[in-house]
Amino acid sequence: MKNFKLSIMAMLLVGAAACNKTYNGTTPKSNSAPTANAGVSTDDAADMASGSLSLNSNGVANVANDVTLNAASVPNTHQACGIVKADTISRQSASGASVTYSYNLTYSFMLLCDTSNHPDSLSSSLIYSGSYSGPNISTTNSGSSIFTVGGLLASAPDFIINGEYKSAGSFKSKTDTAKNGSNNIDIVVKGLTLKKPGRAIVGGSATIAISGDVPKKGNFSYTGTIVFNNDGTATLTLNGTVYTINLYTGVKTRH
């Protein structure tokens, strides 16, 4: 009888081990946790940020160039205080460019004056739509910006920009075809400084928030800070990871 009981117990243990092996080897757990940040890595988010910053993808640097060009022309256009001026631009990349883009932009500019009716600052609002394709990611998006440009007086050495840039649309990764979905980007700019007369970016800062959704994988979210340098780059810190963004080419370098 003792041997019979031991045989039954051994059979049960072997059966349990076999079931467990089959479950672990071939059957996924039904309550498995979603992939962290929907599989969108910090590097992926940095590519999105780069596209929202650089000149060749209708980023903040491009918009800053447009609005300060308009600000520089105020003395020649004799724009009246409080009057809204509209401007529409269609912009495409050059043939054969490594980064391709096509955007339609509609600007509204209003000159703000002091109590003596002298130009004080320029308010700009923008709505845009289009697409770009970079080395690692492609995006179709639309968005807006509201920027105020200070430093209109001829004696001021710099143009100073404060405001917000927003983008919403869809993205596709070129390095992993499984990574595609929707994204939203919000950049709040503070003291973005462009040196006169060439209007090169020489300083300023910003905060950035990137969020979105990947079908069947869930949501992702990243936040960070941006420091605009005086050498054509910006330092992006995203969830603690530091990158250098080339504001002309959009190329990112991780540190």
Please name every model-derived segment:
Residues 1-7:
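Bacterial N-terminal signal peptides that target proteins for export
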Residues 7, 20-21:
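C-terminal intrinsically disordered regulatory tails that are low-complexity, acidic/proline-rich
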Residues 22-255:
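Low-complexity, intrinsically disordered segments exposed to solvent
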